[in-house]
Amino acid sequence: MDASAPRLDCTGTTPPIGYRQYHPDVSINFQCNRWVQWIGPSAVDEVAELAARADTYPELIDGFLGLAQRARGADRALAGAYYDRSAEFFMSATDPRRPAARTRFLTALRTIYDVTPELIAFGSGFMPAYDLRPERQIGPTILMFGGFDSYVEEFLPMIAGMVDTGRRIVVFEGPGQGSALEDHGLTMIPEWEQPVAAVLDHYRLEDVAAVGISLGGGLVIRAAAFEPRISQVVAFDILDDFFEAVARQIGRGVRIPLRALLTAHASRIINGIAGWAAARKPVSEWGLQQGMHVTGTATPYEFLRSTTAMSTGKISHLVRGDVLLLAGADDHYVPLRQLRRQADALVNARSVTTRVFTAVDQASNHCQLGNIGAVSRLIESWLDVTASVLDRDTAARTSAPVHR
């Protein structure tokens, strides 16, 4: 890994970028903050200007493609890469511009950080992975993966900062994610212990700390329930019921009746509701299209049925290691009630630590955008505390937060 490549400050030396108001649509505003988080302060005014004039996804796509071209022309390779990724994010799976935007993003990030993925065989395809090692390792090897719409390259500024502090990080994309999906056709599966086992086998790893980001916060609980080589678990953030999170984006009050309709196999009614929601909310249309693409399903009904399998309620009691559960007080994707529900379900975990980030932290939204450096510090300090303080022969349990 290139030591001169940009790092996200994980030490707290510089002020966090913060979470700003760019756009009145809460989901678009979240995505604007997402890309500014990785690019840095130079992106604030550019994104604000674009958000002020763009109200539709096509306008955002064209705007971010323009910013990417301008950034590349000014030798701002990192900004150009993330602007290409932001445009690609808003594109439909069938948009002819999508493959080129994705290729520019991946090529730029891999060049900037001087990394090349290994391909790990899984099922009918391959999963890309990176083994990023420090000069002198501190603590356990960290196994990291993303969620519903992520490329692991997106996290390289954060990962590089953590490697600088002595952490060895093995990060990979599993079925339904990034290049595993786009290049190798692997669609999402709920049995996340299977790709995790393949990665652990490939690198001959034991006694790892697993960090799951976004939807990965639910997948990591699933993996830890069935994979004994995971001894420490970080849900960044919690997501114990993916269906609940998806239903929340479709509309207020639809979760219970929608679940009943799924139980009744009312596909025609559900597809009609999905069409209504997609016409009303751009994020619903994007989520349904992307969801079908990620899961390899053909209809909204089939996609929504697949989300019901991504729940940790029935398997959380199988987790026996130390667990850190993170949440944002203002997360617009994942309701905060999932934090307590997930914590209460981990009845056999050796320890359970929870942390809710608020606006005071500038990290109160999904995955703590605005102050991801605080999360990196928390994860590292928690790993050190659980390794040095907790008696390995006890089953201590605490809900007291670990502070920065």
Where are these regions (language model features)?
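Short beta-strand/loop motif that positions the catalytic acidic residue
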Residues: 319, 325-327, 331
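Short alpha-helix in the alpha/beta-hydrolase fold that links the catalytic acid
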Residues: 158, 321, 335-345
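Conserved alpha/beta-hydrolase
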Residues: 162-179
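N-terminal cap/lid segment of alpha/beta-hydrolase-fold proteins
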Residues: 54, 64, 92-136
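Alpha/beta-hydrolase active-site loop
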Residues: 154, 185-205
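Catalytic histidine-centered segment of alpha/beta-hydrolase-like enzymes
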Residues: 91, 358-374
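Hydrolase active-site cap/lid region
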Residues: 226-305, 326
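Catalytic histidine neighborhood in serine/cysteine hydrolases
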Residues: 344-364
